[in-house]
């Protein structure tokens, strides 16, 4: 959180954006049955990042939270389409039947998913 009286905050209020790169470390992508997200796809998310001056985004797709093995593939595909903009969190689900396999798959996709969410 930035101090609302700081030089940086004043610059933002006067110019509508900051002169430094913005890196978002918590985002979710794809549709969710119970929550409305206006920017669900990787294409929409990157377009929104461009509009708002966000350089890079670390995310976890909702599909990966419910179905880690298939959802992880979506996350990695999105990152590989936008390698300079997106990074994903690798999901190891608490109800996973084969955590060792999920960890191995996470290591195989570490270029796309450098973070872990348990």
Region roles according to the model:
Residues 1-73, 104:
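An N-terminally biased module of ancient metal coordination in phosphate/nucleic-acid-related enzymes
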Residues 55-56, 66-118:
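Active-site gating/metal-coordination segments in enzymes
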């Amino acid at each position: 959180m930035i101090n609302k009286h700081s030089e940086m905050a004043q610059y933002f209020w006067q110019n509508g954006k900051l002169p430094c790169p913005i890196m978002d470390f918590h985002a979710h992508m794809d549709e969710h049955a119970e929550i409305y997200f206006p920017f669900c796809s990787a294409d929409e998310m990157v377009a929104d990042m461009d509009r708002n001056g966000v350089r890079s985004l670390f995310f976890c797709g909702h599909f990966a939270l419910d179905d880690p093995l298939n959802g992880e593939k979506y996350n990695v595909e999105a990152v590989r389409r936008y390698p300079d903009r997106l990074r994903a969190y690798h999901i190891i689900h608490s109800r996973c039947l084969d955590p060792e396999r999920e960890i191995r798959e996470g290591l195989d996709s570490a270029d796309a998913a450098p973070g872990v969410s348990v």
